[in-house]
Amino acid sequence: MKLLEDKILKEGILLEGNILKVDSFLNHQMDVKLFNEIGKEFKRRFEGCSINKILTIEASGIGIATIVSQYFDFCPVVFAKKVDAANMDKDTYESKVHSFTKNKTYNVRVSKKYINKGDKILLIDDFLANGCAALGLIDIIKQGGAELIGVGIAIEKGFQKGRKELEKVGAKVESLAILDKIENDKVYFK
Protein backbone atom coordinates (compact mmCIF):
# COMPACT_ATOMS: atom_id res chain seq x y z
CA MET A 1 0.00 0.00 0.00
CA LYS A 2 1.87 3.01 -1.32
CA LEU A 3 0.18 5.49 1.03
CA LEU A 4 1.43 3.58 4.08
CA GLU A 5 4.90 3.06 2.61
CA ASP A 6 5.19 6.80 1.90
CA LYS A 7 4.09 7.61 5.46
CA ILE A 8 6.74 5.22 6.84
CA LEU A 9 9.45 6.83 4.71
CA LYS A 10 8.36 10.34 5.69
CA GLU A 11 7.63 9.90 9.41
CA GLY A 12 9.10 6.57 10.52
CA ILE A 13 12.17 6.64 12.75
CA LEU A 14 14.70 3.82 12.83
CA LEU A 15 15.97 2.73 16.22
CA GLU A 16 18.71 0.31 17.21
CA GLY A 17 17.89 -3.38 16.74
CA ASN A 18 15.82 -3.06 13.53
CA ILE A 19 13.01 -1.29 15.37
CA LEU A 20 10.87 1.01 13.25
CA LYS A 21 9.20 3.71 15.33
CA VAL A 22 5.89 4.80 13.79
CA ASP A 23 4.25 6.26 16.87
CA SER A 24 3.56 9.59 15.16
CA PHE A 25 0.84 7.99 13.00
CA LEU A 26 0.23 4.33 13.88
CA ASN A 27 0.67 3.23 17.47
CA HIS A 28 0.66 6.25 19.79
CA GLN A 29 -0.81 9.14 17.84
CA MET A 30 -3.20 7.70 15.25
CA ASP A 31 -3.72 9.09 11.76
CA VAL A 32 -7.40 8.27 11.38
CA LYS A 33 -7.48 9.22 7.69
CA LEU A 34 -4.65 6.72 7.07
CA PHE A 35 -6.45 4.12 9.22
CA ASN A 36 -9.55 4.61 7.07
CA GLU A 37 -7.53 3.86 3.93
CA ILE A 38 -6.03 0.83 5.69
CA GLY A 39 -9.58 -0.36 6.41
CA LYS A 40 -10.57 0.01 2.76
CA GLU A 41 -7.48 -1.91 1.65
CA PHE A 42 -8.14 -4.81 4.03
CA LYS A 43 -11.72 -4.92 2.75
CA ARG A 44 -10.39 -5.17 -0.80
CA ARG A 45 -7.92 -7.91 0.14
CA PHE A 46 -10.47 -9.96 2.05
CA GLU A 47 -13.35 -9.24 -0.37
CA GLY A 48 -15.83 -12.09 -0.49
CA CYS A 49 -14.66 -13.59 2.81
CA SER A 50 -17.31 -14.17 5.42
CA ILE A 51 -16.10 -12.37 8.55
CA ASN A 52 -18.21 -11.78 11.65
CA LYS A 53 -15.54 -10.79 14.17
CA ILE A 54 -12.15 -9.08 14.28
CA LEU A 55 -9.52 -10.10 16.84
CA THR A 56 -6.46 -8.09 17.83
CA ILE A 57 -4.18 -7.64 20.83
CA GLU A 58 -3.90 -4.65 23.12
CA ALA A 59 -2.95 -1.99 22.62
CA SER A 60 -1.66 -0.94 19.20
CA GLY A 61 -3.96 -3.13 17.13
CA ILE A 62 -7.17 -1.76 18.63
CA GLY A 63 -7.37 1.50 16.65
CA ILE A 64 -6.72 -0.18 13.30
CA ALA A 65 -9.09 -3.07 14.05
CA THR A 66 -11.88 -0.68 15.01
CA ILE A 67 -11.61 1.25 11.75
CA VAL A 68 -11.34 -1.99 9.73
CA SER A 69 -14.57 -3.19 11.36
CA GLN A 70 -16.65 -0.55 9.59
CA TYR A 71 -15.75 -2.21 6.26
CA PHE A 72 -16.99 -5.59 7.50
CA ASP A 73 -20.51 -4.52 8.48
CA PHE A 74 -19.29 -3.04 11.79
CA CYS A 75 -18.61 -6.53 13.16
CA PRO A 76 -17.46 -6.69 16.79
CA VAL A 77 -13.79 -6.13 17.58
CA VAL A 78 -12.33 -8.25 20.38
CA PHE A 79 -8.89 -7.58 21.81
CA ALA A 80 -6.76 -9.96 23.83
CA LYS A 81 -5.75 -8.44 27.15
CA LYS A 82 -2.14 -8.59 28.29
CA VAL A 83 -2.82 -7.64 31.89
CA ASP A 84 -5.06 -9.42 34.37
CA ALA A 85 -7.75 -7.06 35.61
CA ALA A 86 -10.17 -7.40 38.53
CA ASN A 87 -13.14 -6.93 36.18
CA MET A 88 -11.95 -9.56 33.66
CA ASP A 89 -13.96 -12.78 33.45
CA LYS A 90 -12.15 -15.71 35.01
CA ASP A 91 -13.39 -18.03 32.24
CA THR A 92 -10.93 -17.15 29.47
CA TYR A 93 -8.94 -18.55 26.58
CA GLU A 94 -5.25 -17.92 27.21
CA SER A 95 -2.03 -18.07 25.25
CA LYS A 96 1.57 -17.02 25.85
CA VAL A 97 2.86 -14.30 23.51
CA HIS A 98 6.38 -12.90 23.27
CA SER A 99 6.74 -9.26 22.18
CA PHE A 100 9.71 -8.64 19.87
CA THR A 101 9.67 -4.89 20.53
CA LYS A 102 9.45 -5.12 24.32
CA ASN A 103 11.34 -8.43 24.65
CA LYS A 104 8.71 -9.55 27.14
CA THR A 105 6.37 -12.54 27.36
CA TYR A 106 2.69 -11.96 28.13
CA ASN A 107 -0.11 -14.34 29.03
CA VAL A 108 -2.89 -12.90 26.84
CA ARG A 109 -6.55 -13.58 27.54
CA VAL A 110 -9.92 -13.33 25.85
CA SER A 111 -13.20 -14.01 27.64
CA LYS A 112 -14.86 -17.21 26.43
CA LYS A 113 -18.00 -15.10 25.89
CA TYR A 114 -16.42 -13.36 22.90
CA ILE A 115 -14.87 -16.17 20.83
CA ASN A 116 -17.46 -18.75 19.84
CA LYS A 117 -17.70 -21.89 17.77
CA GLY A 118 -18.69 -20.86 14.26
CA ASP A 119 -17.14 -17.38 14.45
CA LYS A 120 -15.24 -16.42 11.29
CA ILE A 121 -12.41 -14.24 12.50
CA LEU A 122 -10.09 -11.76 10.82
CA LEU A 123 -6.98 -11.13 12.89
CA ILE A 124 -5.64 -7.55 12.62
CA ASP A 125 -2.40 -6.13 14.03
CA ASP A 126 -0.04 -3.22 13.49
CA PHE A 127 3.20 -5.21 13.10
CA LEU A 128 4.36 -8.67 12.13
CA ALA A 129 7.94 -9.57 13.12
CA ASN A 130 8.44 -13.10 14.47
CA GLY A 131 4.73 -13.92 14.46
CA CYS A 132 4.42 -14.62 18.17
CA ALA A 133 1.45 -12.32 18.81
CA ALA A 134 -0.47 -13.63 15.79
CA LEU A 135 0.28 -17.26 16.67
CA GLY A 136 -0.97 -16.66 20.21
CA LEU A 137 -4.21 -15.18 18.86
CA ILE A 138 -4.60 -18.07 16.40
CA ASP A 139 -4.24 -20.43 19.38
CA ILE A 140 -7.06 -18.55 21.15
CA ILE A 141 -9.24 -18.77 18.01
CA LYS A 142 -8.69 -22.55 17.91
CA GLN A 143 -9.44 -22.91 21.63
CA GLY A 144 -12.78 -21.22 21.00
CA GLY A 145 -13.65 -23.49 18.08
CA ALA A 146 -13.74 -20.49 15.74
CA GLU A 147 -12.30 -20.25 12.23
CA LEU A 148 -9.39 -18.02 11.22
CA ILE A 149 -10.23 -16.35 7.90
CA GLY A 150 -7.00 -14.40 7.58
CA VAL A 151 -4.39 -12.18 9.14
CA GLY A 152 -4.22 -8.49 8.20
CA ILE A 153 -0.99 -6.70 9.10
CA ALA A 154 -0.22 -3.01 8.62
CA ILE A 155 3.60 -3.35 8.61
CA GLU A 156 5.48 -6.63 8.14
CA LYS A 157 9.18 -7.06 8.76
CA GLY A 158 9.67 -9.33 5.75
CA PHE A 159 13.23 -10.13 6.79
CA GLN A 160 11.97 -11.86 9.95
CA LYS A 161 10.22 -15.23 10.22
CA GLY A 162 6.68 -14.13 11.09
CA ARG A 163 5.03 -14.77 7.72
CA LYS A 164 6.62 -18.22 7.40
CA GLU A 165 5.44 -19.16 10.89
CA LEU A 166 1.87 -18.08 10.12
CA GLU A 167 1.82 -19.81 6.74
CA LYS A 168 2.99 -23.03 8.46
CA VAL A 169 -0.32 -23.08 10.35
CA GLY A 170 -2.29 -22.35 7.17
CA ALA A 171 -2.96 -18.65 7.73
CA LYS A 172 -3.65 -16.34 4.80
CA VAL A 173 -1.45 -13.30 5.49
CA GLU A 174 -2.07 -9.89 3.92
CA SER A 175 0.45 -7.17 4.81
CA LEU A 176 0.05 -3.61 3.56
CA ALA A 177 3.72 -2.59 3.80
CA ILE A 178 6.45 -5.24 3.76
CA LEU A 179 9.91 -4.16 4.83
CA ASP A 180 12.53 -6.03 2.81
CA LYS A 181 15.44 -4.75 4.87
CA ILE A 182 16.63 -1.96 7.11
CA GLU A 183 20.13 -0.93 6.12
CA ASN A 184 22.28 2.19 6.57
CA ASP A 185 19.42 4.01 8.32
CA LYS A 186 17.08 3.34 5.37
CA VAL A 187 13.96 1.26 4.95
CA TYR A 188 13.56 -0.84 1.80
CA PHE A 189 10.21 -2.33 0.80
CA LYS A 190 9.44 -5.55 -1.06
Swiss-Prot record:
| EC code(s) of this entry | 2.4.2.22
GO CC annotations on file: cytoplasm
According to UniProt, this protein's pathway is: Purine metabolism; XMP biosynthesis via salvage pathway; XMP from xanthine: step 1/1
Coiled-coil intervals, chain numbering: none
Question: What does the entry list as the binding residues for xanthine?
Answer: 20, 27, 157
What Gene Ontology molecular function terms does this protein carry? xanthine phosphoribosyltransferase activity
The alphabetized UniProt keywords are: Cytoplasm, Glycosyltransferase, Purine salvage, Transferase
The listed locations are: Cytoplasm
Q: Which residues bind 5-phospho-alpha-D-ribose 1-diphosphate?
A: 129-133
Keyword Manganese applies:
no
Reactions catalysed according to its record: XMP + diphosphate = xanthine + 5-phospho-alpha-D-ribose 1-diphosphate
> What GO biological process, any one, is recorded here?
XMP salvage
Assembly, per entry: Homodimer.
Identify its protein family.
Answer: Belongs to the purine/pyrimidine phosphoribosyltransferase family. Xpt subfamily.
What does this protein's UniProt record list under function? Converts the preformed base xanthine, a product of nucleic acid breakdown, to xanthosine 5'-monophosphate (XMP), so it can be reused for RNA or DNA synthesis.
Per its UniProt record, what NCBIfam families does this chain match? PRK09219.1 (NF006671), XPRTase (TIGR01744)
Q: What is this protein called?
A: Xanthine phosphoribosyltransferase 2
